[in-house]
């Protein structure tokens, strides 16, 4: 299921929300309408939490997370950290990271198994990422852009990358991530895909300007039509991966 939304008439929903398979963070403020769109789709399965990070509402660009954990920048206040800790499931680890490239959502992107990071990210941050989020980390660019977190979005089912990504790059990224990739846009031609949408294994939220063609591409590449919110599928995949490794 792919749904359109906007935050105070702003279609960059990926800036104001962070969605994973175990929780969803939504920026404080804004209209209640934005929050209720997420709550309407997700509240039966995962917690939807109002939050700010380092006093900012652009939480989607400030943090990186998956079902195992959440990394936030070092300037996140104790109060914000405590609120997020209290609101998320106990199984989710939350860690503050001291990183020069502090907009973590712009310089890293991940699903539950693999992460792509900015080529200049600190080694220490890379280790924390691998440890807390339980992912394999690759230093990569997307269409020669170092901000991999801005120009690429992927779940455990599929991924959408910058429209100018070459076929060779798509194939390389696809083999690293082990999911099918499609080059495309959101919000009527926006190349900054991660700012315009958020996605997990069964649901996507795109900006209000997203065309029906873009929406159908999102639904097909992320396999949202056949998807059900299910921890069973996740645990089955985990056991399969364990048996293969």
Swiss-Prot record:
NCBIfam families: eIF-6 (TIGR00323)
GO CC entries: cytoplasm; cytosol; intermediate filament; lamin filament; nucleolus; nucleus; synapse
Compartment list: Cytoplasm; Nucleus, Nucleolus
UniProt-listed SMART domains: eIF6
InterPro entries: eIF6
Gene Ontology biological process terms, A to Z: assembly of large subunit precursor of preribosome; cytosolic ribosome assembly; maturation of 5.8S rRNA; maturation of LSU-rRNA; miRNA-mediated gene silencing by inhibition of translation; miRNA-mediated post-transcriptional gene silencing; positive regulation of translation; regulation of fatty acid biosynthetic process
Role of this protein: Binds to the 60S ribosomal subunit and prevents its association with the 40S ribosomal subunit to form the 80S initiation complex in the cytoplasm. Behaves as a stimulatory translation initiation factor downstream insulin/growth factors. Is also involved in ribosome biogenesis. Associates with pre-60S subunits in the nucleus and is involved in its nuclear export. Cytoplasmic release of TIF6 from 60S subunits and nuclear relocalization is promoted by a RACK1 (RACK1)-dependent protein kinase C activity.
UniProt keyword list: Cytoplasm, Initiation factor, Nucleus, Phosphoprotein, Protein biosynthesis, Ribosome biogenesis, Ubl conjugation
Gene behind this protein: Eif6
Protein name: Eukaryotic translation initiation factor 6
Quaternary structure (record): Monomer. Associates with the 60S ribosomal subunit. Interacts with RACK1. Interacts with DICER1, AGO2, TARBP2, MOV10 and RPL7A; they form a large RNA-induced silencing complex (RISC).
Highest taxon of source: Eukaryota
Gene3D superfamilies named in the record: L-arginine/glycine Amidinotransferase, Chain A
Sequence positions bearing Phosphoserine: 166, 174-175, 235, 239, 243
Translocase keyword on record: no
Molecular function terms, GO-annotated: ribosomal large subunit binding; ribosome binding; translation initiation factor activity
Main localisation: cytoplasm
Post-translational modification: Phosphorylation at Ser-174 and Ser-175 by CSNK1D/CK1 promotes nuclear export.
């Amino acid at each position: 299921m792919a749904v359109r939304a906007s935050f105070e008439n702003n279609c960059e929903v990926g800036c104001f929300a962070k969605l994973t398979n175990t929780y969803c963070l939504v920026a404080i403020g804004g209209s209640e309408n934005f929050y209720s769109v997420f709550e309407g789709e997700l509240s039966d399965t995962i917690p939807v939490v109002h939050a700010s990070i380092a006093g900012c509402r652009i939480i989607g660009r400030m943090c990186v997370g998956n079902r195992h954990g959440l990394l936030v920048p070092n300037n996140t206040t104790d109060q914000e950290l405590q609120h997020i800790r209290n609101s998320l499931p106990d199984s989710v680890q939350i860690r503050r990271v001291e990183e020069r490239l502090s907009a973590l959502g712009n310089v890293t992107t991940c699903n539950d198994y693999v992460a792509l990071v900015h080529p200049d990210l600190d080694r220490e941050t890379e280790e924390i990422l691998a440890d807390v989020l339980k992912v394999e980390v690759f230093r990569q660019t997307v269409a020669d852009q170092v901000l991999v977190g801005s120009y690429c979005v992927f779940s455990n089912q599929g991924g959408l990358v910058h429209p100018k990504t070459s076929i060779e790059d798509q194939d390389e990224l696809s083999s690293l991530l082990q999911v099918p990739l499609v080059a495309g846009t959101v919000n009527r031609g926006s190349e900054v895909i991660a700012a315009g949408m958020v996605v997990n294994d069964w649901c996507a939220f795109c900006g209000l300007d997203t065309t029906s063609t873009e929406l159908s591409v999102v639904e097909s590449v992320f396999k949202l039509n056949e998807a059900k919110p299910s921890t069973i599928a996740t645990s089955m995949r985990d056991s399969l991966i364990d048996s293969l490794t």
